[in-house]
A protein has these predicted regions:
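Thiamine diphosphate
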Residues: 2-159
Length: 159
């Protein structure tokens, strides 16, 4: 990592280490710029943090249904990338946000708020607000419609 102007944090992935052939960013001056990993149309998946692999899975499942969805890695969650979000308006009807945290006041709601006065539909996928202690992860995902297949069902119902 070549960035030496600001603090950094290296996170240990909670969902395991996944091999990728994607080039690793060495420089981080793009703070509020999202990275479009795959450019499609009609549906855009913005998958944050440990839910990025879930985003890849959802895009793959949508492709099996004939939908070439855009996949975006937001990289930073503190600000919206207005340029990228505006560009999606040209050939997308639905933006889906995936986050492994609480939806209330989270990243997805920020994206929904950005599109509030436009015709863009936004599906915010995250965990409902609550106190979760000693829970089964699969059951929590299922209860919040966060299983890959459930997300695809919800997308298909909206387009």
């Amino acid at each position: 990592i070549l960035q030496d102007k600001k603090p950094i944090a290296i996170r240990v992935p909670s969902n395991g280490v996944v091999h990728t052939t994607e080039k690793v960013d060495e420089e981080y001056s793009y703070e509020s710029k999202y990275k479009v990993m795959h450019k499609g149309s009609e549906v855009a998946i913005i998958a944050a943090g440990s839910f990025y692999q879930k985003g890849e899975n959802v895009v793959r499942l949508l492709a099996d249904k004939g939908i070439d969805a855009t996949l975006i890695n937001p990289r930073y969650l503190n600000e919206v990338d207005a340029d990228t979000l505006e560009a999606l308006k040209t050939n997308h009807n639905l933006v889906v946000t995936l986050e492994d945290g609480c939806k209330d006041g989270g990243f997805g709601e920020r994206i929904a708020s950005y599109y509030g006065t436009s015709d863009m539909k936004v599906l915010v996928c995250g965990v409902k607000k609550g106190l979760y202690d000693r829970y089964n992860v699969e059951q929590l995902l299922k209860d919040n419609r966060l299983l890959d297949e459930q997300i695809v069902e919800d997308v298909l119902a909206l387009i």
